A protein has these predicted regions:
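Glycine- and charge-rich intrinsically disordered segments
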Residues: 132, 136, 411-432
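N-terminal charge/polar-biased segments
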Residues: 407, 411, 415-419, 444, ...
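Compositionally biased, non-globular sequence tracts
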Residues: 423-469
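Cysteine-centered metal-binding/redox modules
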Residues: 1-413
């Protein structure tokens, strides 16, 4: 008999990756429409946990008005003789996996940024109470992580209680992150990988190092090491570093080998500390995005909770579409907030000296880790809402990026006379170098123009297709 025989909907890995659109949603918890939401796991002593207890503080699912968004706190307390405090982040991240095992439920993100949807179909089938979801969690946790001997779960929907616990949760996350700081990538012989999000991004492999947290911000190197130890066949695994090919970009032979295998050959190389070339892939649960702004040759950072437009006129959701899915896209880099505190943060791209715009809420959280001479030179949404305003701010504040513009302009000016030097009128052989220029015509098709030993100056070029060709 299945351990989910009494559950009104299906439960299993087959439902992972299910996307629930708003029109098919019965209720939504968290997400952009709600300010306060969280999921938190705490390790307790054996006598502090009542095994199997499920508590709901506030209205249950069946008592909520449909087609609305609500605050939600998921607070799980676990105990066991082998359960250690360093496992909290690992257990917590499994909430994402187990929620997606439930037919008609979609879970994205983590920690203080959760986004959950319940479909109309599953509600109609009888999935109308957190008691049911709690039972599923408890059975999955105990089945897949048998070191958990006792587990009690509290669901909070009362907005005031969620807000109260939200502040407590933030302090717990910070304490957990602080424990992981200090260790350097060069000091360990192995990194860790995570494929927990492959149900949404099949080619994504998260590489977790001491100085590069998981994109979701929920798993440190210590968390990953503990997870791989207690669940060696689980989604978190050890990666032998191998040879360091490039210490600045962060390329390792061992990482390349594992990522190639785990991505089914789609991703061949990874540079851990840059947003260009072969950047680390992104799933969909990243806390923030580093995005390149070509007009200023610098990076903007935007987090999931930012509801306004970025200076390039695009919101987080649109940038996320360009970043997620397990792809390597130059200039779009999914990151965690904790990675922004790392000395390896965009190391190959110039680090914080290349960052020009960050939402004030995030800047406040990481300002103690930004070089002091840069803190007031980085614009926020209060300083610049357009690229032009951003340029003016950077010049007025003397951001280092301005010097970069000046040096680039000087280099271009120095190269210009050489480029414009007239060529002697000497006949060139047919074997001389040639340049091919693809020219698009309409939606599909095109011509290929080959220029041989030619220097062309034109204010305007017009190409017209001849009739019948």
């Amino acid at each position: 008999m299945s351990m989910f025989a009494d559950i009104p909907v299906g439960v299993g890995e087959v439902y992972s990756g299910e996307r629930i659109r708003w029109q098919d949603t019965y209720v939504e918890f968290g997400g952009l429409r709600v300010q306060y939401k969280f999921e938190l796991v705490k390790v307790r002593k054996m006598d502090e946990v009542v095994d199997g207890k499920i508590t709901i503080i506030g209205p249950d699912i069946k008592d909520l008005e449909p087609q609305k968004s609500y605050s939600l706190g998921i607070f799980i307390e676990v105990a066991g003789s082998q359960v250690e405090e360093e496992l909290e982040g690992v257990i917590e991240r499994r909430i994402h996996e187990y929620t997606n095992y439930i037919e008609g439920m979609m879970h994205l993100n983590q920690r203080y940024d959760i986004w959950i949807r319940l479909s109309k179909k599953s509600f109609e089938k009888g999935l109308n109470s957190f008691h049911i979801i709690g039972k599923i969690y408890q059975r999955l946790f105990k089945s897949e992580l048998p070191i958990i001997e006792k587990i009690q779960i509290t669901f909070i929907t009362d907005p005031e209680k969620v807000k109260e616990m939200y502040d407590y949760a933030l302090k717990e996350y910070e304490k957990r992150d602080a424990r992981a700081r200090g260790l350097k990538d060069e000091e360990v012989d192995a990194f860790y990988g995570c494929t927990l999000c492959q149900s949404f991004a099949p080619t994504h492999v998260c590489v977790i190092t001491p100085q590069r947290y998981s994109n979701c911000g929920a798993i440190s190197w210590f968390d990953a090491r503990a997870s791989a130890r207690i669940d060696p066949k689980g989604p978190v695994f050890r990666i032998e570093k191998g040879e360091c090919i490039d210490p600045v970009k962060g390329e390792y032979t061992g990482v390349n080998d594992v990522v190639k295998m785990k991505s089914g050959g789609e991703i061949q190389r990874v540079w851990l500390y840059t947003a260009f070339g072969y950047p680390h892939t992104s799933c969909g649960c990243f806390e923030g995005i580093a995005f390149y702004i070509p007009e200023v040759d610098g990076f903007g950072i935007v987090h999931r909770g930012f509801a306004e437009l970025t200076p390039i006129g695009v919101p987080f959701s649109k940038l996320a579409d360009s970043t997620a899915g397990g792809r390597q896209v130059d200039g779009f880099h999914g990151i965690s907030i904790e990675y922004m505190r790392s000395p390896k943060f965009l190391q190959a791209d110039g680090g914080w000296e290349r960052v020009v715009w960050v939402p004030s809420a995030v800047l406040e959280r990481v300002k103690d880790f930004i070089p002091k001479h840069l803190v007031d030179k980085i614009a926020t949404e209060k300083d610049a809402k357009t690229v032009e305003e951003l340029k003016n701010f950077l010049v007025a504040k003397g951001h280092p990026i301005v010097k970069r513009w000046e040096e680039k302009a000087k280099a271009e000016a120095a190269a210009k006379p050489v480029e414009e030097k007239a060529l002697p009128a000497v006949a060139a052989p047919e074997a001389a170098a040639e340049m091919a220029v693809p020219v698009s015509v309409g939606v599909v098709g095109g011509f290929r123009i080959i220029l041989k030993n030619a220097k062309i100056r034109a204010e305007r070029v017009k190409i017209v297709r001849e009739k019948g060709k």
